[in-house]
A protein has these predicted regions:
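A residue-level marker of the well-folded mature domains of exported/periplasmic proteins
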Residues: 22-330
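Core hydrophobic alpha-helical membrane-spanning segments
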Residues: 7-13
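Positively charged n-region of N-terminal signal peptides that target proteins for export
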Residues: 1-5
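C-terminal motif of bacterial Sec signal peptides marking the signal peptidase cleavage site
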Residues: 15-18
Length: 330
């Protein structure tokens, strides 16, 4: 069904450019650039990675007057076909979301040398690919410091989608930040795993309760759509708090999500789309950290009073030290 939706969407765009394109060109004097995005599994509504990516291109569509379409694959096996579909349909930029896109994009990109591609959280060394990476350790260090200051048990938790080096960078930064402010801290880590690690809220809720039963009172979830299970767990347990990831999840359970480590996929995609429109988009690796506007904490909208001005000032000071280089998150 999703392939049919994509096909119909592409067909409508081709019909538009074939039939109504002359009128558009007469009105604006220029052709709209087309951007297609293949989301990661879990799709929209994850309040995390995919939602952030979508928000960035929606903003780019409004500000740069581009055509924008997206597709939500049901499984990893569909990634390559959807990337190929967009490129074959003549899209100017095809965006691949997530590290699992690396292998499919390596196969597709060389077949379309005149099409520009961008991939988030992976490196594809092709002359027509922009690889977008984030210094997630910096943001995880920040939220780890929040957890280290706020825990009442000196025990905090981490839930990852799978146990792999890329995701463990989040865990490592989180541990380092917690230890930076609280030398007595213990961090317990569990992983969702299974056949759909980034879209299994039931398993993430089970792991959240297991961590709670082992004294963890704050849990950082880095598991895409599975993280909804963590949010459900904190909503049902008065003495359990969450830290969100990728998008601002603070409002999902007001007052129970201390902060969110915002990996600003939205800002990165907005930036490279602007470069595309200006004819300045180049291939290669782009790294977005706190200093580059690619990483931040959320605004503590619902937890300012709970955390308190003194701790918030310490968190701000840590951020400034990271930007200046005084604190280096290795």
């Amino acid at each position: 069904m999703k392939k049919l939706v994509l096909f119909l969407g592409v067909l409508m765009i081709l019909m538009f450019t074939g039939c109504g394109g002359k009128k558009e060109a007469a009105d604006t004097g220029e052709k709209k650039l087309k951007v297609g995005m293949v989301l990661s599994t879990g799709g929209l509504g994850d309040k995390s990675f995919n939602d952030s990516a979508y928000a960035g291109l929606v903003r780019a569509k409004e500000d740069y007057n581009i055509e924008f379409n997206y597709v939500e694959p049901a499984s990893i096996s569909e990634f390559g076909q959807f990337l190929d579909d967009y490129a074959a349909a003549g899209y100017d930029l095809v965006v691949a979301i997530g590290f699992n896109m690396e292998s499919p994009l390596k196969e597709v990109a060389p077949n379309y040398p005149d099409t520009k591609f961008a991939v988030v959280d992976a490196v594809v060394d092709e002359p027509n690919v922009t690889s977008i990476l984030f210094n997630s350790k910096e943001g995880s260090f920040m939220v780890g410091a929040v957890a280290g200051m706020m825990t009442k048990t000196d025990t905090i938790g981490y839930i990852g989608g799978i146990d792999m080096s890329f995701l463990n960078e989040f865990r490592d930064g989180y541990v380092a930040g917690a230890e930076y402010v609280n030398p007595n801290i213990e961090v317990r880590s569990l992983y969702v795993g299974g056949s759909n690690p980034f879209n299994d809220p039931a398993k993430a809720k089970e792991l959240s309760l297991a961590l709670k039963n082992n004294d963890a009172d704050i849990i950082y979830g880095v598991a895409g759509g599975s993280g909804l299970g963590l949010l459900e767990a904190v909503s049902e347990n008065e003495d359990l708090y969450a830290i969100g990831v990728d998008s601002d999840q603070d409002g999902a359970v007001e007052g129970k999500v201390l902060t969110s480590m915002m990996k600003r996929v939205d800002n990165s995609l907005y930036t490279i789309t602007g470069e595309l429109v200006e004819g300045k988009l180049e291939n290669g690796v782009r790294m977005f950290g706190i200093k580059e506007g690619g990483i931040s904490t959320s605004e503590f909208k619902f937890t300012k009073d709970l955390i308190g001005e003194e701790k918030l000032a310490k968190i701000k000071a840590i951020e400034e030290k990271i930007i200046s280089g005084e604190v280096v998150v290795k």
